[in-house]
């Protein structure tokens, strides 16, 4: 059980820093990933940024320069969070959770943030001058902290013994998930269940729960397949175009799952990319596969890739969701393996730190963060090479995004704190 200490007592005492130790392997790997990200964001946006002029104002409009600023802010956040005993967050988790819910409600108010907050029909961002804030990213941190707090304060064992805790967890994770889905932002919502389930697993919840959860997941997949099949039947029966008549099935009276037509289209383009509008729905993934396949062993050279430079891989996604495809084309198999190796260092080190944690709280936090990063890495790269449908999940520390980068730094700072305070230096 977590020792009862006041939050103030868990804040850093810089006079004792020489007595603690830092895990240097993870931050070095994260720094390398950040540098790679900046380099290939620059490459992916090169043809766009060349005409933006010079000077600070022009630089602030360039994604690669803004990414450097995001990494700088994130680095400061990483160090600050690492210096604080991770047990401090147990006392403020509920306040942090409530604070993170506020922008999730705000972003749903029509017109509250202006047109800049609405992209591709989704309200996911709150504009802040030349930057924007994505509330769903901080919501992931809030769910992590509240889940960790509930698990260490509760008795976890059989499903019957854990029902009360599971109900609280479902509510704590369910509220932000619903708000995120309403934006709609499926990609940010689907990463929460694996994170929570991994934290439940390390808390030694009965295997029967996970067997039941697996069964429910398989039923959900079956329901999605059934819904998508009915969607195809409806569109063909009514002479609708999968690319032009978006929203037609959503507005129909047929019984259906609460999915958007563009999400169904992504599933169809994944299952049969040659049949379902390969030049529309399936364009991004087809161009991504061409990028990865054309890189060879060592690639075409930095800034020399044709898919992103000529716009075949759309510039709107090349620097974020599909940046791994840019890396694979320009640096080939060797560059791809390097990126995977760096992520492997971060993820395996996260598991190692969880195993050396001083208490269950530290283990739960480290495993939760590692699981969250694992989902991001696996789904993003699998999406890039055509193993899963397009979801838009970004690649940590490499994909462009301010809120995402800073939140990733905060989460890794928590893992570093678990390592630093694995022993009591008081």
Where in this protein do the model-derived segments appear?
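Hydrophobic, glycine- and aromatic-enriched re-entrant/interface helices and adjoining loop segments
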Residues: 117-125, 212-333, 360
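Interfacial segments of multi-pass membrane proteins
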Residues: 190, 195-209, 306-335, 393-401, ...
């Amino acid at each position: 059980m977590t020792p009862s200490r006041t939050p103030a007592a868990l804040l850093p005492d810089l006079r004792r820093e020489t007595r603690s130790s830092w895990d240097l392997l993870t931050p070095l790997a994260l720094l390398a990933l950040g540098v790679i990200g900046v380099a290939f964001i620059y490459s992916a946006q090169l043809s766009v940024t060349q005409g933006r002029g010079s000077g600070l104002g022009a630089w602030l409009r360039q994604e690669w320069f803004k990414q450097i600023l995001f990494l700088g802010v994130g680095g400061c956040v990483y160090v600050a969070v690492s210096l604080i005993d991770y047990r401090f967050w147990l006392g403020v988790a509920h306040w942090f959770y409530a604070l993170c819910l506020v922008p999730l409600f705000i972003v749903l108010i029509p017109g509250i943030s202006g047109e800049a907050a609405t992209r591709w029909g989704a309200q996911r961002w709150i504009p802040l001058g030349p930057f924007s804030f994505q509330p769903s990213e901080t919501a992931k941190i809030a769910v992590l902290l509240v889940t960790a707090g509930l698990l260490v304060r509760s008795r976890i064992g059989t499903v019957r013994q854990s029902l009360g805790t599971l109900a609280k967890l479902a509510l704590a994770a369910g509220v932000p998930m619903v708000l995120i889905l309403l934006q709609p932002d499926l990609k940010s919502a689907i990463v929460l269940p694996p994170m929570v389930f991994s934290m439940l697993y390390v808390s030694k919840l009965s295997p029967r729960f996970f067997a039941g959860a697996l069964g429910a997941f398989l039923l959900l997949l079956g329901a999605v397949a059934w819904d998508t099949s009915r969607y195809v039947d409806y569109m063909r029966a009514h002479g609708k175009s999968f690319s032009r008549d978006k929203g037609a099935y959503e507005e129909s009276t047929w019984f259906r799952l609460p999915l958007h037509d563009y999400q169904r289209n992504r599933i169809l383009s994944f299952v049969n990319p040659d049949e379902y509008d390969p030049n529309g729905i399936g364009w991004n993934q087809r161009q991504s596969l061409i990028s990865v396949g054309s890189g060879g062993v060592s690639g075409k050279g930095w800034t020399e890739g044709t898919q992103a430079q000529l716009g075949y891989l759309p510039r709107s996604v090349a620097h974020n969701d599909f940046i791994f495809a840019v890396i694979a084309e320009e640096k080939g198999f060797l560059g791809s393996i390097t990126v995977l190796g760096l992520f492997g260092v971060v993820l395996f080190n996260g598991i190692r730190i969880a195993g050396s944690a001083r208490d269950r709280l530290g283990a739960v936090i480290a495993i939760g963060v590692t699981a969250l990063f694992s989902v991001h890495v696996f789904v993003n790269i699998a999406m890039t090479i055509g193993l899963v449908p397009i979801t838009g999940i970004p690649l940590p520390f490499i994909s462009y995004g301010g809120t995402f980068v800073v939140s990733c730094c905060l989460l890794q700072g928590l893992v570093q704190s678990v390592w630093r305070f694995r022993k009591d230096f008081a």
